[in-house]
Amino acid sequence: MQQKIPIENLYYLLCYAWGVSDQLDKVKVDGEKCHSLENLLSMVLFNACDRLLRQGLLRAYRFEEQEVEGVRGKLNLAETLKSGKHLNGRTICQVDELTQDVVINRVIFSTLKRLMRIEGIDEDIRARLRKTLAKFPHIEEIRVTEGLLGRLLQHRLSGFYKLVLNICRLIWDSTLPCKDKDGRLEFLDFTEDDFRMNCIFERFLMNFCKQNCRDEYPEVHREYIDFQLSPFGMMFKETGEALPMMETDVTLFNPN
């Protein structure tokens, strides 16, 4: 029988796999309160969001068209004349507004809303999610896709935002609509997917070695080994037999 990875250990495994192990101490996880993956991810996300809200959500300028008194920004003369607003001293202008209602915060907000629909989350954790949602400023809920998350994670983000977005991505990847239950979602246990867990463990192993073994092994990388070109492979060359190419999970090398 396959042994389950302890919940707290899984959180450390994921943080190393995502390359954000330096953020581990910023979000505390109580293993005794997290007896399931959906509860674990919910707890990590609302604790992370509480931290983001305290330090201030990411803000950016967004191009908007607004009706204003006088002129501000770039005047849209055609729309102003067409609407007749100028007769009352008002205009329609295109302005840049500094706002927290930006894509990355929309993804986080929408993920919190998604968690509220997942069956199996404990009521005390659901209450914390509800409390965290109430703290958010006006942010639009959006449809989150794998493509959108992938593009956001390619940006230069702070380590903490990178952690939060990876949690969001895992939640969206692991939820499906429940059959015959309108609006409710089922959480899929990704630890039962051997291929997915192999990928996670490979990334964990690589990043763990890079961070903790550099002093003794300066070079940490993956390596392709072509047995056909090795002395052992040459023995089979004349027979026409092919040997496989192997890719290591991680190779540690000390040139000394």
Predicted regions: what is each one?
Residues S174-K181, M206-H221, N254-P255:
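Secondary-structure boundary elements
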Residues Q154-S158, F187-M206:
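A short, highly charged nucleic-acid-interacting micro-segment common to nuclease
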Residues T191-E192, M197, N212, H221-E223:
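Conserved adenosyl
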Residues G150, L185-F195, Q228-G233:
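Active-site-proximal beta-alpha loop/turn segments in soluble metabolic enzymes
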Residues E38, Y161, N198, E202, ...:
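Active-site-proximal structural scaffolding
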Residues V220-P255:
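Active-site metal-binding core of divalent-cation-utilizing nuclease and nuclease-like domains
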